[in-house]
Swiss-Prot record:
PANTHER family recorded: TETRAACYLDISACCHARIDE 4'-KINASE, TETRAACYLDISACCHARIDE 4'-KINASE, MITOCHONDRIAL-RELATED
InterPro entries in the cross-refs: LpxK, P-loop_NTPase
GO biological process: lipid A biosynthetic process; lipopolysaccharide core region biosynthetic process
UniProt catalytic activity: a lipid A disaccharide + ATP = a lipid IVA + ADP + H(+)
Residues holding ATP: 63-70
Signal peptide: none
Family to which the UniProt record says this protein belongs: Belongs to the LpxK family.
Protein's name in the database: Tetraacyldisaccharide 4'-kinase
């Protein structure tokens, strides 16, 4: 974790690092002013929002990275598909080698991997059979393609809370209950894209990793969500549902790591959460190689991690999101496996169902009115 990231997530700056704070505070003020001005333009209608012609549900967050948006997007998309909807997920495609609009999955076939699409769209495509996944910088254009070309009648906007150019019928904001706002500052002084007051735009707050949160802090977050949205939050835990080989094609069984010595290999915003997941599976974490979020492991880095694991009498274990970035030959290495995570709802399933149904009804009415 870099010096700036440690400051973001509430670690005290060392004496030699405190010199970074002054320029970061100045930059934070500029960022705050820009974000406020842009938000005011949308709030006033001076910046217009495009309508997709079908219901749109956004999954987003306030802080950058690691809140649990991807498991939430998978859970919401699956629930919409279970309602008989033809669902398409629209993602920016962070880390992709191409910046044009791309169909990652048409719902029947996965067409692109993580290299061209980015790790999150590639993972969504693999985890959501029957759901289309598109990626590109202009979500309004992706929406048009999803509706007119792929026949989608419901859209999930991945990481869409700040992407206000596309109108939505429900904003779901995901907060990591264990550390929702870091040090409380905006970028680049802290991890937040907007002040927490932005939660008033949300229709539903989703608290992830509630099993890792302090109960007093959790009660405060529940009160914050209720005050902001008028509705109690959805609450979930990151549940490890399977251990799979590095190609993600073969299940090794959820108990495969119980009692095993492992080296945690990840490219995540919050690697500590992955270590806790491994502990929950009964593994003994004897080493770690943690890289920045969306990092693509080089051959040298992967070889070093595998050698270190072998030297410690351990197995290298990575996340499903990291594994999709691996070249097929490297993913097939038998010394490597991955953990598959789902968002397991522990509270608020009824709130989620009501919010989704209301958003679908609202979007359908607006679509008929526009037509």
């Amino acid at each position: 974790m870099s010096v700036v990231e440690r400051i973001w997530w509430g670690h005290r700056a060392a004496p030699g690092e405190a010199v970074l704070l002054a320029p970061l505070l100045l930059a934070e003020g500029l960022f705050r002013a820009g974000a406020a001005a842009r938000g005011a333009l949308y709030d006033s209608g001076l910046l217009a929002q495009a309508r997709a012609g079908v219901p749109v549900i956004s999954i987003g967050n306030v802080a950058v990275g690691g809140a649990g948006k991807t498991p939430a997007a998978i859970a919401v998309s699956a629930r919409l598909a279970a309602r008989g909807r033809r669902v398409a997920v629209l993602s920016r495609g962070y880390g992709a080698s191409r910046r044009d609009a791309r169909v990652v999955s048409d719902g029947a076939h996965v067409l692109l991997g993580a290299g061209e699409a980015g790790d999150e769209p590639a993972l969504l495509a693999r985890r959501l059979p029957g759901v289309a996944v598109l990626c590109g910088p202009r979500r309004a254009a992706l929406a048009a393609t999803a509706v007119t070309t792929l026949g989608a009648d419901a859209l999930v906007l991945d990481d869409g809370f700040q992407h206000r150019a596309l109108a939505r019928d429900l904003d779901v904001v995901v907060l990591d209950a264990a550390n929702p706002f870091g040090n409380g500052h905006l970028l680049p002084r802290g991890p937040n894209r907007e002040p927490r007051a932005a939660l008033r735009r949300a229709g539903l707050v989703w608290l992830s990793r509630v099993d890792q949160a302090d109960e007093v802090a959790l009660e405060a977050l529940r009160a914050l969500a209720l005050e902001a949205t008028g509705r109690a939050p959805v609450e979930s835990r990151h549940a490890p549902v399977d251990v799979v080989d590095g190609t993600l094609a073969r299940s090794l069984g959820r108990e495969a790591l119980r009692g095993a010595r492992v080296l945690a290999l990840s490219g995540l915003a919050r690697p500590g959460a992955f270590r806790r997941t491994l502990a929950d599976l009964g593994a003994e974490v004897v080493g770690e190689r943690a890289f920045p979020d969306h990092h693509r492991f080089t051959d040298r880095e992967l070889d070093e991690a595998l050698r270190a694991a072998e030297a410690a009498g351990a197995r290298a274990v990575t996340t499903e999101k990291d594994a999709v970035r691996l070249a097929p030959a490297r993913a097939a290495d038998p010394r490597l496996c991955a953990v598959r995570i789902d968002a397991e709802l522990v509270r608020g399933e009824d709130h989620l169902a009501q919010s989704l149904d209301a958003a679908l009804a609202r979007g359908d009415v607006l679509s008929r009115s526009a037509g």
